[in-house]
Amino acid sequence: PSQVIRGTASAPTVNVRTIATDGEYADGPARVLLPLLGIYALGTVSLQGFNLVYLRVAQDIGAGDASGLITAIPGIVLGVACFLYGTLGDFIPLRRIVDVGIALIVAGSLLGFAFSSSLVGVIVARALQTLGYQAAASAYMILATAIRDPKKRGLYVGLMCAAFQGGTAIGMLSGGILADINWALLLLIPLAGLACLPIMGRRVPARAHAGRVDIVGLAIFSSLALLLTL
């Protein structure tokens, strides 16, 4: 017999133990969240490594007074991406966002390594990589903060902070080592995140809330954020 539940409906949350037809959290949150965390951590390693050796990079490619752009542009992209993905995650399936992010990481890594002698090539490549790994980070936080169990939610949010700190430390170490070998190898580090894909599979949720993306609003906000940081 059917049951009728009366009362105010609560806001929808992600049930991490629900086995959905699209594979959402089929084996628990760890099979989804930890691979996303790995992708983010490797992106942080590359980012922080470049922040350490950017003057050496500028010297090798003859960037001159434009050397600051090597770190400034990816930093601006990171700030805009944090807001952008957080908003798009309400309307676009997280799986699609993650798929696009992986594609951007691959494109940025290969492009940057191939054109590592060009200032524009390095900047564009690092911007693409930043957009890519931040997609994984945003998807991670959206899913982690939706976990109902407060202890597990706190654990996964804490792991994100640990991944950033660990990625920063390893990035500094990697930058110092690779600066004297070949700093362009820093651009290939995010590719190691591809090893996380078989673990994650297609378990990232493919569902999205109904609604319309305010393209104009996003464009205005992104432009203002860009102007404020320049």
Task: Indicate residue ranges for each PLM-predicted region.
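Hydrophobic transmembrane-helix bundles of small-molecule transporters
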Residues: 181-230
